[in-house]
Amino acid sequence: MWFTKSSKDVLKEMNVSEKTGLSTEEVKKRLEKYGPNKLKGKPKKSLLQLFLAQLQDMLIYVLIGAAVINIIAHGKDGIADALIILAVVLINAVVGVVQESKAEKALEALQQMTTPKSLVRRNGEVIEVNSEELVPGDILVIDAGRYIPADVRLIESANLQIEESALTGESVPSEKDANFITTDAKIPIGDKENMAFMSTMATYGRGEGVVVETGMNTEIGKIAQILDEDNNTLTPLQVKLEELGKILGYGALAICGIIFVIGLIQGREAVDMFMTAISLAVAAIPEGLVAIVAIVLSLGVKTMSRKNAIVRKLPAVETLGAVNIVCSDKTGTLTQNKMTVVKTYTLDNLRDISSQDGQKANVDETELIRSFVLCSDASVENGQDIGDPTEVALIVLGNKFDLEKNALNTKYKRVSENPFDSDRKLMSTLNEEGGKYRVHTKGAIDNILTRANKILVNGEILPLTEEEKNKILKVAEEMSDDALRVLGVAFKDVDSQILPEEMEKDLVVVGIVGMIDPPRTEVKDSIVEAKNAGITPIMITGDHKNTAVAIAKELGIATDISQSLTGAEIDEIPDDKFAKEVNKYRVFARVSPEHKVKIVKAFKEQGNIVSMTGDGVNDAPSLKFADIGVAMGITGTDVSKGASDMILTDDNFTTIIHAIEEGRNIFNNIKKTIIFLLSCNLGEVLCVFIATLFGWAIPLVATQLLWVNLITDTLPAISLGMDPGDKEVMTRKPRNPKESFFSEGAGMRSIVGGVLIGVLTLVAFYLGIIHSGTVPISAVKDSNPATREILTYGRTMAFIVLTFSQLFYSLSMRNSKKTIFEIGFFGNKFLIGSIIIGIVLQIGLTSIPSIAQMFKVTAIDPSHWGMVIGLSLVPFVVNEIIKVISRRRND
C-alpha cells in the first residue's frame, strides 16, 4: 500500500536516494529480478497456427475438393494432378505464412521504435532511458506531456495534473499532491493523490517520484488491459482492394460457370470441365491483392524508418502521396533547434554575447540572467543538453557569466511554480532565500509588459512608463527583424508564498534576450523540391511575425510580409472568410493550439490534403484533425506522438518531403501491381473462354493454370511492389485522393495487356496444334486418343507463351509513361531475379520428363522457341509503343 506511506518511508524501503537515484549496477540487478517494464501482449501465433490459418479459405477448400474428385474420377491417372494441386495449396500457405510473419515482425519493430522514453535520475544525473528499462526504485522525473511509464509514488509535485482515464474512465485530469497520505486502504485509484500510474498521462505541471511497480505488477497490468492499438485492421486502400477483389471474383466465377456449362453442352467431360473451371477461378480471382499490398506497405514503412520517418498508422502511407499542404513548426523543424543567446537588452543597454566563458555582467544583466536560469527546467550535465533547447540556451548563458544553475538552485530553492502553457506564453517560479521570496517570470515580452508596472534600472526598481515599454518593444522588433527569437524576463518580491495565479501580476520587467536558431541548410532545397511537386510549405510558429517572416523569406516559403498572419489577426477574421482566403497565406505567427486547429480546418475546407507538425501537449487536437499528423521524435511529448500518424526521429522538415516522395512511390507501386495482376488474370480467363466458345480443346489444364497463378502472383507482382520508384515523381502534382486505380489510362492498359496475353496464348496453342499439319484444330480433343500428343504439344506452347508473356510484360509495368529503355532494364533487381527464376522454372518444368508428365507438357521443337519468345514479347513491345505514342500526343 504505497499510498499509505510517506515518501521518506517509500524511499527507505526501496533503498534509494532521491538525489542520486540508483546506480547502473543496481539497475542491472533489479532488471534481472523484476524483468522488463512492459505488459504482456496477446500471445504470438505459432508457425503451425499461422499455416493452418492460411488454409481457412473457401477457394482452398474448393481446390482440395477438386483434387479428391479428380482422384475418384480418374483413379491413378488423377493422382499426379491431385498432388500438383495440393503442392500449390501448400506453397501458397507457406508464402502466406512468410508474408504474415514479415508483417508481424515489421509491426514489432515499429512498436519498438515508438516505445516511450522516460527521464530518470541515475548515478546522480538525469538521463533519458527506454521505458522498458525502468525498475522499481528508479527516480522518475515527470513533466507535462509525458506518459507515466510505471506505477510511481510521488515524492515531489508542482501543480501536477495527470489524466487517468485509462484506469478511472474520467477524462478530467486528477490533481496530484506528493504530501498526501491516507490510512484508507480501499481508497479508489482516482483519489490516490500521491500516486501516478502506468499508462496515464501528465497534462500539466511537473513532479518526481519513485517507481514502485513495473510491468504486470502495475495497476494496469493487474487488470491485464492491453492498451496497444490494433495494428491488424485493414487500411482504406486494402478495404478498396478487398471490395475490388470481390467484384472481380464474382465476375470471374460467373465466367467460369458459363465455361463449365458451355463445356457440358459441347459434350466435354464433366470432371475435366469442373477442374478447369475451378482452376480458372483460382487463377482469375485476385485473392493475393490484399496480401501483396500489405507487403508493399510494410516494406514502405521499413524504408521510411531508415529515412527517419516512423509511420505509426499504415493508412498514413497511402495519404502521404496525396498531401499538398505541409504545415510545419519553425523551431527545430525548419531550423536547427540549436538556440544560442547572442544579444541581451536591459533598459538602454544592448549587448552582444560572445562564446567565451567568464564574462562580466552589470547589476541589471546579472538579475536578467539569474531570473532566466532560475525560471528554467532544462539542465546541461556532462556536456549533455537535457530539456527544451530554448531553456538550454539560457542555462548556457548563465554558465558564461558564472551563474551556474545548480549553484543558483541550491541558494534560491524553488518553492512552487506556474508552468508554461501556450495560451499565456509565460512560465513563473517562486524561489526562497533566507525567508524571502521572489517570483521569476519568463516568456513573450509583450505578455510580460501587460503584466508589469515597474522596471529595473541600474539596480533600482522604478515605475514603468509607456516610453520605456516602447523602447523595449522597439528593440524586440529589431531583434525579430534579424530573425532572432525574443524572450523577456521579469520578477517581483513577495513577503510569503503565493498561489500560482497570483504570480504574474505587478511584475518588475528586467529586459529581453535575442536567440538565434539558424535555418537547417538542407531545408531550402527541400522547399524547392516541395514546390516543384505541387506541395505548399506553410510555417506555423509561436514566434513574432517579423522573426517568422525573416526565416520564411530566407527559406523561400514566403516572399512578403503580406503573406503572414498572427493569431490575433486570425481571431478578427470570420471563419468562413478565413477559409476562403487561407490559401494565400504562407506564415502564421504568434499562434495558439486553437489557431492551429482553425488553420488546418480552413485548409481542408478548400479541398487540401494537410500535413501538420506538432510537439506539445496542446498540439494533439491539430495533429488528429490533420490528414497526416506529424510528431517530433526529439522534442515531441508522448502526447503529441500518441496523436500522430508519423514521427520524425530527426525533427527535420526534409524528412517530411522524403516521406511524401516515398508515399507517392508506394501508391504507384501498388497501382502497377494491381494493373499487372488484373492484366494477367484477364488474359487467362479470355484464353480459356474464347477457346471454349470456338469449341476448341481447353488450351490450359487445371495444373498449368495453378502454376501460372503461383508464378505471376508471388514473384513479379511482389517485385513490382518493391520497385525503387520513379525519380521524377516529385515533379508531378499530388494525386487526387479519390483517384481510381484505373485512372490515367491504367484501366485501358489493363484491358489491352489482358487481351494481348489471352489472344497470343491462343495463337501459340493454335500454332502448336497445326504444326503437324495433319489434323484440323476442331478435331483435337481430350477424348480422342489419336490427337492427345498434338494437344499436349499445343498446350505446352500456350503454357510457355502465357508464362513468358506475363513475365516479360511485368518489365513494361514499371513505368506508365517512360519506356524500359529510358528507365533502365536493371533498375529493379528483384524483378529481374523474378523473371529469371520464372523462366528457369518454366524451362525445367517442360524439359524434365517426370515433371513434364505431371503437368501434361512436353519438350518443344528447338525451332519453335523463337516463335514462343517472339509471341511472348508482343504484349511488352505493344505497351512500350503505346507509351511513346501517348507521350507524343500529350507533348
Tell me the role of every PLM-derived stretch.
Residues 758-770:
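Transmembrane alpha-helix/helix-exit interface in multi-pass inner-membrane proteins
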Residues 712, 795-810:
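Generic alpha-helical transmembrane segments
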